Amino acid sequence: MDTGFIDHGKIESYLANTLPPEKSEVREILQEARQLKGIGFDRAERLLMLEDPALLEEVFETANFIKNEIYGRRLVLFAPLYVSNLCMNDCLYCAFRKSNKEISRKTLTIEEIKRETEILVSQGHKRILLVSGEGLGLSAVDYSIKAIEAVYSVKVPPNGEIRRVNINIAALPVESYKRLKEARIGTYQLFQETYHLGTFKAMHPSGPKADYLYHLTAMDRAMEGGIEDVGVGILFGLYDYRFEVMALLQHIRHLEERFGVGPHTISLPRIEPATGSEIADNPPHRVSDLEFKKIIALLRITVPYTGMILSTREDAGMRRDSFSLGISQVSAGSRTNPGGYSQEDAGAQFSLGDHRTLDEVIHDIASMGYVPSFCTGCYRLGRVGRDFMDLAKPGLIKRFCLPNALTTFKEYLVHYSTPETREIGEKVIESMLQEVPDAQTRAKTEEYLQKIVDGGKDLYF
């Protein structure tokens, strides 16, 4: 069967016939990586074969250096908003699959979506990822657009609102992506789950998602439809992680060659237990913690300007470790079932590893010296897609990122945080303010911070 731009034979031959790199080669690659321009995908494939624990530590140190140089100590926060768990697919690893009788099914009404949004806004969230199963057929896009409009319409005094809605829904035709673009979505996100054709077909026995090529080319159609920011992802544990990473790099290369820019984000979930799924309970290719850290670090080194996302599938310890390796966005206070923020419900897509509230996550992040960020400035000023990368790669985007992180964090501290989080958060802001790169921007940031204390909101560069 045609596998599109994923060259299975090349990947399988490489994995079968290639030895791990020597110390000298690893260090040469890492030295190149420290130039902050990424490394060739052939070089990344060499690091992928690395198993020596001592050399892996050097890879981790390099990834940490790159993360700090490009992103500083910022972590973007968001929450998923699940609006429907109806699904026509029968993905073996997912609790939403149509044959699963062990969960209750629900599609939120527009009023219920607004209520869920009000709860998220009242916690302090500014960014959400709208998620839906593939169960609404021809009406899915109409429903999604109404859901997006509902989220944006919610205002909770004194300054509560969602400022960026990203969306994760099934693969669509070009015309539908054009409609989503008009609805003011941020990033369109869709996971390939596995790039390995045999595994993909085994894991997706029926439903629209069973079409490997249609699913694989979704990002092409999204970008043809005018969506500048797209997010890709792999569900690690379904097949050999080395194959998956090499295929992901081929996908990125394809997008760069065709559209001039790769994905805006890469999501890195590991398969976790899901109600009614034996596969989820016993992954066929379980990825160890060390292997997972290698994946994160390798991708940060290879595509240094691409956002990398870790969800609450992972426990607090792994999430902490991942920050220094390259993760730049994390979800917080998540629920993975429709209506989950307003009531507990047995309809979740998968089990969570991190059950903490948003404030508890923020307190933890701030105590580590990171700045929690709710920034949406680039999206609203049109710094997206290729324009974003044109600013990011020369290092110019940093002029905006830290000040915007500080102002959005200040909004959270003033209006939503506990006293304990506010105390540590103010210290982080005071410290990080000194790292704003130029005096003029620093002065303007201080002005914005004071305006927020005085009642201002949504101040960004």
Features from the language model and the residues they span:
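Acidic, glycine/proline-rich low-complexity segments that act as flexible tails and inter-domain linkers
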Residues: 10-20, 26-58, 66
